[in-house]
From Swiss-Prot:
SUPFAM superfamilies: Aminomethyltransferase beta-barrel domain (SSF101790), Folate-binding domain (SSF103025). The gene is gcvT. The glycine cleavage system is composed of four proteins: P, T, L and H. PANTHER family: AMINOMETHYLTRANSFERASE, AMINOMETHYLTRANSFERASE, MITOCHONDRIAL. This is Aminomethyltransferase. The glycine cleavage system catalyzes the degradation of glycine. Transmembrane segments: none annotated. GO terms for biological process: glycine decarboxylation via glycine cleavage system. It comes from the Bacteria.
């Protein structure tokens, strides 16, 4: 029996096409994935992300615990509400999950983890907490709605009350604030401006309806995937997992090597990987017809004339750009051209940094 979010009936009201997503009944689209994609790039769209898992980490050792648990360093967070992105690694340096951590105070943090990895994440976190004076509390009574797009903030402002609008006025990216019953954060998974709003389940339907009446278009998993891929954002399970280290997943910037004496999980293994060298994640664009898909092979010839091979981790047709884009894990010796094997033919592609569209515009 699939899990249903508190917004399940709202999806049906908007003719959502429901599919199983890691054990959750979630909307793939509400009629047109392309229209939903363009709504977020050009106007405002909203997503039910209530299947994500909110976990509060509270106690005297909360900071010390998270400095051990995460490859990024929460000690960098000094201003209440400031957030950071990073990986939770195993002892081999593999990515257990990628997550966002909000600093609320020196003894209180909030983390948001992926739905597909919830059980293993919670098991790992609870295993690691031994010896720390910390309470780890899952918050299943909270739902979450993401409103994204160039007009998302203005439209959301017509829904929030005066106190909430005052609390978020001028809030920079990657911050969150509790205001009234809502936790409103300037985060997202689309490459557009907007908010992710954590709301008590009892209030979620009314908030969704208010956003709908404010002209924010419901968007499903299909658009969420094309938007995040255009933005060059990883999807756990495709672009990285426990078999992949963050340096090979374009997450090197999220590893805080300093201070050198912070012994975060996986550090020793990752230092060895860094010294020996590892693959990297690149972006690919293809002018030819067709769509690059996950699992296809990538070939290129290195500077020594040796053929090298990599693999597509995520690929799609980009509605914004009008051609196929992909992310691929490849040997570091790759240049700016390669070939992708499609239907037993090799098709030329350009190699770029893994970021294609930001704030509605081409990013390369």
């Amino acid at each position: 029996m699939a899990n249903k979010t508190v917004l399940f009936n709202k999806h049906l009201e908007s003719n959502g096409k429901m599919v199983d997503f890691h054990g959750w009944d979630m909307p793939l689209n509400y009629g047109s994935q392309i229209e939903e994609h363009h709504a977020v790039r050009q106007d405002a769209g909203m997503f039910d992300v209530s299947h994500m898992t909110v976990v509060d980490v509270i106690g005297d050792d909360a900071c010390a615990f998270l400095r051990k648990l995460l490859a990024n360093d929460v000690a960098k967070l000094k201003v209440p509400g400031k957030a950071l992105y990073g990986g939770m690694l195993d002892h081999n340096g593999g990515v257990i999950d990628d997550l966002i951590t909000y600093y609320l105070s020196d003894t209180e943090y909030r983390i948001v983890v992926n739905s597909a990895t919830r059980e293993k994440d919670l098991a790992w976190i609870n295993e690691q907490v031994n010896g720390f004076s910390v309470e780890v509390t899952e918050r299943p009574e909270l739902a979450m709605i993401a409103v994204q797009g160039p007009n998302a903030k203005a439209k959301a402002a017509t829904v929030f009350n005066a106190e909430q609008n005052a609390a978020i006025e001028g809030m920079k990216p990657f911050f969150g604030v509790q205001t009234g019953s809502l936790f409103i954060a300037t985060t997202g998974y689309t490459g557009e401006t907007g908010y992710e709003v954590i709301v008590p389940e009892a209030d979620a339907e009314a908030l969704w309806q208010a956003f709908l009446e404010a002209g924010i278009k419901p968007c499903g998993l299909g658009a969420r995937d094309t938007l995040r891929l255009e933005a060059g954002m990883n999807l756990y399970g495709l672009d990285m997992d426990e078999s992949v280290n963050p340096l090979a997943a374009n997450m090197g910037w999220t590893v805080a090597w300093e201070p050198a004496d912070r012994d975060f999980n996986g550090r020793q293994a990752l230092e060895k990987i860094k010294a020996e060298g590892t693959d990297k994640l690149v972006g690919l664009i293809m002018d030819a017809k067709g769509v690059i898909r996950h699992g296809m092979s990538v070939f290129f010839t290195d500077s020594d004339g040796v053929e090298q091979q990599g693999i597509i981790t995520s690929g799609t047709f980009s509605p914004t750009l009008g051609y196929s884009i992909a992310m691929a894990r490849v040997p570091r010796s790759i240049g700016d051209v390669a070939e992708v094997e499609m239907r037993k033919k090799r098709v030329p592609v350009k190699v770029i940094a893994p970021s294609f569209v930001r704030n509605g515009k081409q990013a390369f």
